[in-house]
Amino acid sequence: MPQTLHVHSRVKDYDILFTDHVLKTLADCLGERKQRKLLFITDQTVYHLYQTLFEEFAQQYNAFVHVYPSGGQSKSLERVSAIYDQLIAENFSKKDMIVTIGGGVVGDLGGFVAATYYRGIPYIQIPTTLLSQVDSSIGGKVGVHFKGLTNMIGSIYPPEAIIISTTFLETLPQREFSCGISEMLKIGFIHDRPLFQQLRDFQKETDKQGLERLIYQSISNKKRIVEQDEFENGLRMSLNFGHTLGHAIESLCHHDFYHHGEAIAIGMVVDAKLAVSKGLLPKEDLDSLLQVFERYQLPTTLERADVSATSLFDVFKTDKKNSEQHIIFILPTETGFTTLAINKDDHQFVEKLDSLL
């Protein structure tokens, strides 16, 4: 499915390249940089799945590889420091490049290293999960966790290019596929109801071209949003639907309990319930959301982990979206979205939250 989307950024424009031939597309992206040093950053899972691909990279380029333990715990300043050490040891200059190959953790981590090493070196993203292809790789957000807080340290630093290949999804476990669908449903529910309806009816096993079309449509929606509001002052805030609660769940629960897309699904359900309670969203829309989550085996409650509303509320207070005095939720409406500001001292809201979980 060779296609290209061009993303306009106030920092730096870049292309999203859809391809069935990753090696050729990467070579085209590198151009004259083929002779420069490249550091490929990936995790153990991706490295073992695609070791032959990394061997081909090593044959064609002046390439080094940084492989780290899989999982969100590696999205840390300690791992950043280890990658800095390798860049320094191999004498990487400002003209050399990083290539990230993996899911959202790999992209966020590698992008953060690229943004901060020598105050910024170029990088290319090759996302290998559905979630990273449709969401985390798009828009330039990079960062790491800090002291148990999700994405606490980061920046907006766009890549030179993003290479999208659905062939990577052939090795993706069903649970991770559903996590990607969760983010696609998020953008569809708020911004593109026809996309939401297509995802509701989609048959993965029999419609590969349909999946490619849905991925392209989802990415196109996010591209449009980040071009209008790159630094999240208005419209891009809508993409945080489900994320206030979702990030708190991720901070308090082990990754085995809830993966990112699953935590966001629970967050979307609670945000939608809040919207229904305030007359902003028809209950039929909430029911539709619950039905499609059930179809993709996405959780809608916190039954897998023993987490209290009080502990969640305490984590809310550290959320990046907050104002000085308020916790910010993104609520879906019949025609889009709105924000809900909850006072950080509103203990009655804790009781309300407890009733919604």
Swiss-Prot record:
Cofactor: NAD(+); Co(2+); Zn(2+)
Annotated binding of NAD(+), by residue: G104, V105, V106, G107, D108, T128, T129, K141, F168, L169, E170, T171
Entry keyword set: Amino-acid biosynthesis, Aromatic amino acid biosynthesis, Cobalt, Cytoplasm, Lyase, Metal-binding, NAD, Nucleotide-binding, Zinc
GO annotation, biological process: amino acid biosynthetic process; aromatic amino acid family biosynthetic process; chorismate biosynthetic process
Pathway participation: Metabolic intermediate biosynthesis; chorismate biosynthesis; chorismate from D-erythrose 4-phosphate and phosphoenolpyruvate: step 2/7
Reactions accelerated catalytically: 7-phospho-2-dehydro-3-deoxy-D-arabino-heptonate = 3-dehydroquinate + phosphate
UniProt subcellular location: Cytoplasm
Cellular component aspect of the GO annotation: cytoplasm
Stated name of the protein: 3-dehydroquinate synthase
Organism expressing this protein natively: Streptococcus pyogenes serotype M3 (strain ATCC BAA-595 / MGAS315)
Gene responsible for this protein: aroB
